[in-house]
């Protein structure tokens, strides 16, 4: 199964930090955001990855590409630890790129992947969203997809007053964390939201999704919304995710994500805790 990572958005909510660099390249503790997304795909058993980029996104390609000058400098300086880290990035996966020429929404971005997907089921990872859990979020979806052979999305609970920031689902619980999706609404007001279950930013989709996108008129913000296209599918399942989700375009979640990863580092944990306590 192939992975598609949309990463063409401008990141306007993070300006001025994103004026000269993609939001997907903003650092989360020690690595760029999109590095964690690619790692999740790999840990879910996927090594064929298509990243959908746009203007001013060249640094994403440069990051995953081989850097001969940097490797030569590190080798000459005897910095073997850093040389190993740099080479590991290049060898992560087979990554291809395609440009979304016009930013017409997530649905339109996914259409850019149709030729690469070549009629097979595929996964979608939003390039500005990081998930953390014992079992990768996408792996949970793939397992459900392999059982039902129907498009499957990740969902999670969000505060009722935050539904206007997410795609929200109307669903029926089948068993445990498994839901049958009845309808999807893009960023509804709290009073109009069918639930507080939001789409997490991870999907396993069948190839007929492309037909549904082509049949979808521009919706919220005048963009072709993936949620509108998914609502046209005959059958759609949701898996409730219970791990951590960090939407990097939300400033507080971006800050929390770095703290979350830093707390796993024995070298800095105690100093970080002491620093945060100084504000209490």
Residue spans of the language-model regions?
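Conserved beta-loop-beta/alpha segment of the NTase-like Rossmann-fold superfamily
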Residues: 70-72, 80-171, 207, 214-215
């Amino acid at each position: 199964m192939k992975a598609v990572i949309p990463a063409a958005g401008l990141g306007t909510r993070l300006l001025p930090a994103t004026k000269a660099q993609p939001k997907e390249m903003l650092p989360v503790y020690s690595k760029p955001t999109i590095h964690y997304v690619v790692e999740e795909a790999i840990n879910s058993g996927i090594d064929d990855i298509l990243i959908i980029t746009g203007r001013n996104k060249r640094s994403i390609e440069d990051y995953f590409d081989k850097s001969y000058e940097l490797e030569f400098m590190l080798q000459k300086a005897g910095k073997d630890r850093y040389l190993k880290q740099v080479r590991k990035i290049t060898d992560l996966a087979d990554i291809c790129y395609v440009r979304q020429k016009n930013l017409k929404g997530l649905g339109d971005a996914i259409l850019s992947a149709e030729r690469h997907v070549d009629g097979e089921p595929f996964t979608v990872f939003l390039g500005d969203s990081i998930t953390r859990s014992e079992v990768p979020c996408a792996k949970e979806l793939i397992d459900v997809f392999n059982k039902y052979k129907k498009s499957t999305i990740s969902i999670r609970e969000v505060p009722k007053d935050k539904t206007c920031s997410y795609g929200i689902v109307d669903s029926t619980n089948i068993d445990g964390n498994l839901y049958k999706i009845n309808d999807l609404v893009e960023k509804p007001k709290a009073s109009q939201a069918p639930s507080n279950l939001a789409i997490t930013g991870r999907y396993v989709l069948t190839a007929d999704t492309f037909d549904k996108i082509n049949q979808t008129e521009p919706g919220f913000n005048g963009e072709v919304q993936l949620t509108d296209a998914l609502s046209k599918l005959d059958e759609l399942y949701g898996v409730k995710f219970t791990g951590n989700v960090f939407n990097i375009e939300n400033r507080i979640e971006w800050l929390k994500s770095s703290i979350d990863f830093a707390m796993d580092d024995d070298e800095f944990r105690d100093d970080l805790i002491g620093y945060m306590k100084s504000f209490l």
